[in-house]
Amino acid sequence: MARLHSGKRGSSGSTRPLRTEVPEWVSMSAEDIEAKIVEMAKDGKQSAIIGNILRDMYGVPSVKLVTGKSVSSIMKEAGFYTEVPEDLFNLMKKAINLRNHLENNPRDTHSTVGLKLIESKIRRLVKYYRGTKVLPAKWRYSPDTARLLVE
């Protein structure tokens, strides 16, 4: 798939093998995995990072295959999932860091263009999440509220 804000082609990636049952080499049970997810969520880790840690350190190829639930749904049940979705939160963090950079370097025009692209992507995501009722209908993005949410 092509990149959003450039004329370049995207890079191809590998696909995960199609599995319907848990591999026999997975040593952790579903309860152990859920406890580990809750423990890492208490430490403040995001669901994508938790999934990578479980894959790389504990040998769990797919949490959903073992437990029947995704990492984010396990975090929601335990009460550790944020009210703002993670992809939107990460984009807001990126926009705030870029704004801080532009305060110190106001003539950096390339970063100014990058900030506009990031914020347009944030607005598109907010529109999507408002339509799917993940965010309230009155929720608006502004750099000041984003700074308060992230910090």
From Swiss-Prot:
<dbReference type="GO" id="GO:0003735">
    <property type="term" value="F:structural constituent of ribosome"/>
</dbReference>
<protein>
    <recommendedName>
        <fullName>Small ribosomal subunit protein uS15</fullName>
    </recommendedName>
</protein>
<dbReference type="InterPro" id="IPR000589">
    <property type="entry name" value="Ribosomal_uS15"/>
</dbReference>
<dbReference type="GO" id="GO:0006412">
    <property type="term" value="P:translation"/>
</dbReference>
<dbReference type="InterPro" id="IPR023029">
    <property type="entry name" value="Ribosomal_uS15_arc_euk"/>
</dbReference>
<dbReference type="Pfam" id="PF00312">
    <property type="entry name" value="Ribosomal_S15"/>
</dbReference>
<keyword id="KW-0689">Ribosomal protein</keyword>
<dbReference type="Pfam" id="PF08069">
    <property type="entry name" value="Ribosomal_S13_N"/>
</dbReference>
<comment type="similarity">
    <text>Belongs to the universal ribosomal protein uS15 family.</text>
</comment>
<comment type="subunit">
    <text>Part of the 30S ribosomal subunit.</text>
</comment>
<dbReference type="GO" id="GO:0070181">
    <property type="term" value="F:small ribosomal subunit rRNA binding"/>
</dbReference>
<dbReference type="InterPro" id="IPR012606">
    <property type="entry name" value="Ribosomal_uS15_N"/>
</dbReference>
<dbReference type="GO" id="GO:0022627">
    <property type="term" value="C:cytosolic small ribosomal subunit"/>
</dbReference>
<dbReference type="InterPro" id="IPR009068">
    <property type="entry name" value="uS15_NS1_RNA-bd_sf"/>
</dbReference>
<keyword id="KW-0687">Ribonucleoprotein</keyword>
<feature type="region of interest" description="Disordered">
    <location>
        <begin position="1"/>
        <end position="20"/>
    </location>
</feature>
